Amino acid sequence: IEVLLGGDDGSLAFIPNDFSVAAGEKIVFKNNAGFPHNVVFDEDEIPSGVDAGKISMNEEDLLNAPGEVYKVNLTEKGSYSFYCSPHQGAGMVGKVTVN
């Protein structure tokens, strides 16, 4: 699945922001706008035993240009919340369910 970071209208959002994948399915987060974005998983809102640091971008790393991507495979079933650290306060958050 491809998830866009930033709407075509300039909105600070993940599109889609709530979706499901199969365990091990590749998720491609793609910068859709000229704003710097990243993808950080919330260590308190992922399945127990999953290391948020291994699935998240470093908070200092940013996808600066349109078309830049971050890819991740989630293998543990459950619910994962994530956010863009520069824009979390603006509501740029999302959730993926791994089945």
UniProtKB/Swiss-Prot annotation:
GO terms for cellular component: chloroplast thylakoid lumen; chloroplast thylakoid membrane. Its cofactor is Cu(2+). It comes from the Eukaryota. PROSITE patterns: COPPER_BLUE. Cu cation binds at H37, C84, H87, M92. It is found in: Plastid, Chloroplast thylakoid membrane. CDD domains: Plastocyanin. GO terms for molecular function: copper ion binding; electron transporter, transferring electrons from cytochrome b6/f complex of photosystem II activity. Residues 1-99 form the Plastocyanin-like domain. It holds the Pfam family Copper-bind. Coiled coil: none annotated. Disulfide bonds: none annotated. It is a peripheral membrane protein. Keywords: Chloroplast, Copper, Electron transport, Membrane, Metal-binding, Plastid, Thylakoid, Transport. Belongs to the plastocyanin family. This is Plastocyanin. It comes from Cucurbita pepo (Vegetable marrow).
